[in-house]
A protein has these predicted regions:
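Bacterial N-terminal signal peptides that target proteins for export
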Residues: 1-10
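Hydrophobic h-region of N-terminal signal peptides that target proteins for export
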Residues: 12-21
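Hydrophobic small-molecule pocket/channel-lining residues, especially in calycin-type beta-barrels
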Residues: 22-153
Length: 153
């Protein structure tokens, strides 16, 4: 009887460990905005995502040209400096997981000013990429949150 109980306990622990170690979703691909971004110039109409066991690389193209940001999949901080109009903006990036949602945080420092953009990525049942982004209102108001839907292109 004791062996059965120990065996059952080992089985339960193994199942729980297996569920915890499930693979995270892959966001790799070319994506095109399918929801109306409104007047928010910070939402890119297209983006390319490359994801492997070490890095997530997001390349967006929009009003401000091409922008590439890399994130370390292990959760450590990374650097993604941005050259803009002859100036360098220092950017620190970090990736974290909240269940099957990926949380991307990018902090930018420029001219003594610092601001943070946080994005929560998830995949819908139909394979669409859902992004909820929160950034500062650069007009002096509180944070601005936008929700965007992308389809693979």
């Amino acid at each position: 009887m004791k062996r059965l109980s120990i065996g059952s306990a080992v089985l339960v622990v193994s199942l729980i460990a297996g569920l915890a170690a499930q693979a995270k979703p892959s966001f790799t691909g070319s994506w095109k905005l399918s929801s109306d971004p409104g007047a928010d110039a910070f939402i890119s109409p297209t983006m390319a995502v490359a994801q492997d066991e070490k890095l997530l690389t997001v390349t967006t193209t929009g009003q401000f040209g091409e922008l590439k940001t890399t994130y370390n999949v292990d959760g450590t901080e990374g650097k993604s400096p941005l050259d803009f109009n002859g100036n360098t903006i220092d950017r620190t990036s970090k990736l974290a997981w909240d269940g099957d949602k990926m949380v991307l945080t990018t902090t930018s420092d420029f001219g003594g000013q610092s601001f943070e953009v946080k994005q929560v990525w998830s995949l819908a049942a139909d394979g669409s990429l859902l992004i909820e982004a929160t950034r500062p209102d650069f007009q002096g108001g509180g944070p601005v949150t936008t929700k965007s839907t992308y389809k693979k292109s």
